[in-house]
A protein has these predicted regions:
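Helix-loop-strand module that forms the ligand-binding subsite of alpha/beta enzymes
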Residues: 1-77
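Glycine-rich phosphate/pyrophosphate-binding loop and the adjoining helix
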Residues: 68-127
């Protein structure tokens, strides 16, 4: 979900609220969940949105997969490095507001691939 005005977008909130019937039956209990977030700013309150996604997963009794990467926070780090935004709860992506989807920084794309593999590997271990 994108972060928009301090939280996940209204479209995601609509989806989340529509899951209440599944919650009553615990239909997603022990399912694997993961999340990512994008905003135009480097921080942009992405953590708030990820915690909302993680909380929804927890309410459903799900198993949340963290990012599992150390941050790239040395002086030599660039936007081409894995986890250069320093996420831990889930994937963080930053896209300038005037950029096209083809201009997402390579480090964010590579981090997304790494996170997708992690979610798949953990899902396979639990299967």
């Amino acid at each position: 979900s994108p972060t928009y005005m301090c939280s996940p977008s209204w479209q995601f909130k609509k989806f989340a609220e529509a899951t209440s019937k599944i919650w009553f039956t615990q239909g997603w209990k022990d399912k694997v969940f993961g999340g990512f977030n994008n905003s135009a700013s480097f921080n942009g309150d992405k953590q708030v949105s990820l915690i909302a996604l993680q909380t929804l997963a927890s309410q459903h009794g799900g198993i949340w997969v963290s990012l599992g990467l150390l941050p790239s926070n040395s002086k030599d780090a660039t936007r081409k490095d894995l986890n250069n935004l320093g996420g831990s709860v889930g994937l963080l992506v930053q896209s300038p507001s005037d950029a096209s989807v083809d201009e997402i920084p390579q480090g964010d794309l590579d981090t997304a691939v790494s996170y997708g593999k992690r979610v798949a590997e953990i899902t396979a271990k639990l299967a």
